[in-house]
Amino acid sequence: MSEELQQKLRDQLWEVANKLRGNMSASDFMYFTLGFIFYKYLSEKIEKHANDALVDDEVTFKELWAMEKDTDIEELQESVKTECIENIGYFIEPNFLFSSITESIKKKENILPILERSLKRIEDSTLGQDSEEDFGGLFSDIDLASPKLGKTADDKNTLVSNVLLALDDIDFGVEASQEIDILGDAYEYMISQFAAGAGKKAGEFYTPQEVSRILAEIVTLGHARLRNVYDPTCGSGSLLLRAASIGHANEIFGQEKNPTTYNLARMNMLLHGIKFSNFRIENGDTLEADAFGDTQFDAVVANPPFSAEWSAADKFNNDDRFSKAGRLAPRKTADYAFILHMLYHLNEGGTMACVAPHGVLFRGNAEGVIRRFLIEKKNYVDAIIGLPANIFYGTSIPTCILVFKKCRKEDDSILFIDASKDFEKIKTQNKLRPQHILKIVDTYRERKEIEKYSHLATLQEVAENDYNLNIPRYVDTFEEEEPIDIHAVIKEIKELEVKRTDLDKEIEGYLKELGLVE
């Protein structure tokens, strides 16, 4: 599908979202809109899959379920249901498909009860199956009784019906071979648009595509194919999907604390065509309840919440993730708790890249102890990349990317890149353009030194700076100003004073001519 048609799908979906906006917050109408889009996608996907499975039987999915029941029909129905659950993870009976709901809408029926049952039936179809964890509670955030949808039941039914009818008019391209790229791209666009309007909440579920691209490119360098990729604070899963796509990862793993965002991440995986058996997204607090034990991964990426609080409980002094660093990360700034957690899950030949506030580079006390441990004792720090300010939704603070490897050699240097001035301002947001991303990735790949942009610092140099990683200590971006000619400035001032005197006299003459002064 051409870029023009992709943009058309984006615009159509965003227009549908605006039908729901009303008095809702950006995050509220996001979950309704994306949930309905996902429901339509699942419906179209299973109808196509079932029809393909029934080609030899010369009957369609809907026709089969409309037939009068007998033993042969029931056996064929059960066979189709089993085949669907085993291959795509779920099942929807024809009368609960999106298309069946819209047919009811056109008959002016109240569709909220059957829509609610339809969403529940999708989840229930996976009970006891391998896909249960990926579908359980998936639609729990779609509350069709919510007053946000309208004051009365009729108001709610009218609004939801209008949204579903608008979606019904949009071709998702499920019949096309490139379906995943088309709808996946549109879904990502929708999430980014919601993030733009969500303010501070945006950081909870979305990493800008430009930053995701840098992280993904870095962790996949040197790997023709990743076995797996992991994000401990995965949000909507966009960063995970980008890394998995670039690295051709076989499996995707993530954890997300917010239950609503966790549902969004699972939807995002399925809608991008990731088979239920190839991803595992867990709901829970990564630091307090690690869902992945001692599992290690080829690539680890993350955009953890900046300077979040955590318990820093005494029990963590005996936790293998944190115990060797000498100190726990402070209770009010968990940045290094996330970093140590990620390193624990990184395998010996892997690469980890995460976003963090600049404070992690220079703050002292416990964080200084941990930073020194990672540099002096472990030699894990591979690169520090300074990003422009105001590139994340909801915060204008400058950020950096930290890159870690466990397989560094003793004499390896640490690469510092100052990309803080490379951006394009678009309205109130700064954006990294493709050439800026390429420059960062190329500089990292080649480990190049570029004047006023990058520097390779020896471990000795870092030690002499007391393990302070603040980028200006290593990359001199100072621009000398041209020397000022004092005598020329004085001469110019005198000439301006003469001109001012002449103008005063000229103005006074005009005022006299007008009789305004004597």
Where are these regions (language model features)?
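Non-catalytic, mostly N-terminal accessory regions of nucleic-acid modification and defense proteins
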Residues: M1-V219, S277-T286, A291, G386-N390, ...
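Short small-residue beta-strand/loop micro-motif enriched in glycine and branched aliphatics
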Residues: A195-A198, N250-E251, E424-K425
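A conserved structural/catalytic subdomain of Rossmann-like adenosyl-cofactor enzymes
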Residues: E4, D290, D294-E518
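Conserved S-adenosyl-L-methionine
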Residues: K201-A302, S307-F316, F322-A325, Y336-A337, ...
